[in-house]
Amino acid sequence: MYSLIRKCLFLMDAETAHNFSIQALKLAGKLPINVLPMPLNPVEVMGLQFKNPIGLAAGADKNGEAIDGFGKLGFGFIEVGTVTPVAQDGNPKPRQFRILEAEGIINRNGFNNLGVDVLVENVKKAKYDGIIGINIGKNAVTPIERALDDYQICLRKVYEHADYITVNISSPNTKNLRTLQYGEALDDLLRSLKSEQESLSQKFNRYKPLVLKIAPDLTDEEIASVADGLVRHKIDGVIAGNTTLSRDPVVGLKNAEHQGGLSGNPLNTLSTRLISTLAKELNGALPIIGSGGIHSVASGQEKIDAGASLLQVYSAMIYQGPALIQNLAKHIQVR
C-alpha cells in the first residue's frame, strides 16, 4: 500500500510532498478510527510513562498541526517544532532534497514555522494521549548574543502544554546557532534555562523535563564538554542528535552537493557514535534519546545498545512508510 503512496509523493518535490502528507495526516487525525494500532512496549524515562519507546522527531510537524494523525501511526511520543517566538518563512526554496540511492534527505529549512502561539493552540486541541514534546529555537533575526531571550519566551509559552521541552541549539540552518553548543555560551544558556524551568515548575506545580538537542558533528572532546554541562546544570535528557553537515556517506550521489543538514540512513553510523561517546561521558547521569538514521529494528536496537533510552524517527518513514514505526515499537528492547 505505502509503495503506491510513495510513488505518488515522490512525483512531487520533497517539500510539496511533505506539506501534502501533513494535510493528509491532519485529516486522518479527525477520523474516529486508528489508522494503525498503538503498540504497547512501555518504558519510563525522565519520570514520564511512554507507551512505547518510538517517537516522531522534531521537524516533521513544525506547527503541531497533525499530532492526532501521527499519533494514529503508533508513535509512543511526538515531538513538535522547532518553533520560534514569532512566525518566520525560513530559508529560500528549494530547501529540501532527496538522496534516493541512500534513502537520505538534505534540508536547509531554517526553522520555518507559524510561531509559538499557533503551535500552543494546536497542542491544546490535540486529543493524542501519548507524550508530547515541544522543540524550541530562536528566530533568524535574533542576534546570537540575544538567543537566550527567544528560548525563554518559548519556554514560558509552551511549558504548561508540553510533557517535556527540547532546546534546539544544533540545527545547521540558522546562522551561528551551533556556537551555543560550546563553552561559556552553553554554560550560560543551560544555567538560565534551568533557572527558568525551576520557576515555571513552581508556578504550575508540575515539573516538566528539559532536554538539549545536539549535533552529531561534535568531536569527542566537545561531546565531553557538553556532557559535563548537562550534568552540572541538571538537564533532564539529551537528544543525540540532529542532522549532519558531513557528506562523506553520500559523496557523488545526486543532490549530495546541496547545502544543509543531512538526515536519513547516511546519518546512522555518525549518530550511533555520538550516542556511544555521550553514554560513556554521562555514565547514566541522564537519559539519551537516539535520533538519526534509524531505518530498521537492527539499527534502532544498535542505538539502544549504545546507550539510548528512547528513539526518534522521521526521514526513514518517508521512504518506508508507517510500517517501520509499528516494527520498531513492537520489537525494540530497551535495557
Swiss-Prot record:
Reactions catalysed: (S)-dihydroorotate + a quinone = orotate + a quinol
Name of the gene: pyrD
Domain of life: Bacteria
Binding site for FMN: 58-62, 82, 135, 168, 213, 241, 264, 293, 314-315
Pathway in which the depicted protein is active: Pyrimidine metabolism; UMP biosynthesis via de novo pathway; orotate from (S)-dihydroorotate (quinone route): step 1/1
Positions with a binding annotation for substrate: 62, 107-111, 168, 173, 242-243
Protein name per its UniProtKB record: Dihydroorotate dehydrogenase (quinone)
Top EC category: oxidoreductase
Cofactor(s) annotated in UniProt: FMN
One of the GO BP terms on file: 'de novo' UMP biosynthetic process
Gene3D superfamilies registered for this protein in UniProt: Aldolase class I
Origin species: Actinobacillus pleuropneumoniae serotype 3 (strain JL03)
HAMAP family hit by this protein: DHO_dh_type2
EC number: 1.3.5.2
Pfam families found in the cross-reference section: DHO_dh
GO CC, any one term: cytoplasm
Main location (coarse class): membrane
Cofactor, free-text remark: Binds 1 FMN per subunit.
